[in-house]
Curated annotation (Swiss-Prot):
It comes from Thermoplasma acidophilum (strain ATCC 25905 / DSM 1728 / JCM 9062 / NBRC 15155 / AMRC-C165). GO terms for biological process: DNA replication, removal of RNA primer; mismatch repair. It catalyses: Endonucleolytic cleavage to 5'-phosphomonoester. Manganese or magnesium. Binds 1 divalent metal ion per monomer in the absence of substrate. May bind a second metal ion after substrate binding. Keywords: Cytoplasm, Endonuclease, Hydrolase, Manganese, Metal-binding, Nuclease. The lineage of its organism: Archaea, Methanobacteriati, Thermoplasmatota, Thermoplasmata, Thermoplasmatales. This is Ribonuclease HII. GO terms for cellular component: cytoplasm; ribonuclease H2 complex. Its EC number is 3.1.26.4. Residues 5-207 form the RNase H type-2 domain. Its main location: cytoplasm. Its cofactor is Mn(2+); Mg(2+). A divalent metal cation binds at D11, E12, D104.
Length: 212
């Protein structure tokens, strides 16, 4: 691929949290432009730098994204795995992509994910772990996904209070979950109820209620 050619990439943000949405983005752009603005994996950038690059990417590149809110994920995960959900969204996004698309691989086996996506979409793809650190278009997609998810998390913070990052490793998130699950019969609006962390807390709460 020459510097003047376009590159397409797909990446997600928010796959692991117990609170908030997962965002999956497709970016197709001139490779020379992506290198000029020095995109890199969103996790290696400050929030300010991500926002700056986000504006440049949105202004010059072809961008599509999907926001899967907790209620969407809860409904889908009643019947499908998270991998299958992400696979479905990727296949849908590929309708808007150029011929070859690089994907940050969601499966532990790269070849399996690549074969399934190519078979379902009829498109040529390359699925790689840590693709966001290898291919500029995937880096750009990771930035778009992260910035959009951060904006969604900010809105949830404004509405529900400080729940931290939303990741199960965050003590603030766990403290919020304990209180929120105790006070709300239907937590599915912001909480991913199929996550093991949530199931353990729900089970613990039910057991405590039985004691009184």
């Amino acid at each position: 691929m020459t510097e003047s050619e376009r590159q397409c990439g797909i990446d997600e943000a928010g796959r692991g949290p117990v609170i908030g949405p997962m965002v999956i983005s497709l970016v197709c752009c001139d490779l020379s432009f992506l290198k000029e603005i020095r995109v890199k994996d969103s996790k290696a950038l400050t929030r300010k730098r991500r926002s700056e690059l986000f504006e440049k990417i949105m202004g010059r590149c072809s961008v599509r994204y999907r926001i899967l809110h907790p209620k969407d994920l809860n409904r889908m995960m009643a019947a499908e795995s998270l991998n299958k959900i992400e696979e479905d969204e990727i296949v849908d996004l590929l309708r808007y992509a150029d011929d070859l698309v690089y994907i940050d691989c969601y499966d532990v086996i790269e070849e399996r994910a690549q074969e399934i996506i190519q078979m379902r979409s009829g498109r040529q793809v390359v699925c790689k772990h840590k693709a966001d650190a290898i291919f500029p278009a995937v880096s750009a997609a990771s930035i778009v996904s992260k910035v959009i998810r951060d904006a969604e998390i900010d809105r949830l913070h404004d509405r529900f209070g400080d729940f931290g990052s939303g990741y199960p490793s965050d003590p603030r998130t766990i403290d919020f979950l304990k209180k929120y699950l105790k006070e709300n019969q239907d937590p599915s609006e912001i909480v991913r109820i199929h996550w093991s962390t949530v199931q353990r807390l729900l089970h613990s709460e039910k057991n405590q209620k039985k004691l009184f």
